Amino acid sequence: MVSMARPFLADPDFVNKAAAGQAELINTCIGCNQACLDHTFGGKLTSCLVNPRACHETELNYIPTARAKKIAVVGAGPAGLAAASVAAE
């Protein structure tokens, strides 16, 4: 039996990316269990540290701009990488 719950929280497009041969684009679960299992067992809303939108998709909507914009992201920590990823979409 294979458990895929956490990887699907980390990247809901996991299967599509794998089927398309784009494994390098999969947002990988780091196995921290902090926002998924700890929150679940603590009676809190489940989420994911590598995908903060997990279980919050209807609340955290990204609205595309009318036209493309050039931006600069300063920093390569988790917040900077997440901001760059969202901006690229």
Predicted feature locations:
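Flavin-dependent oxidoreductase catalytic cores
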Residues: M1-V74, P78-E89
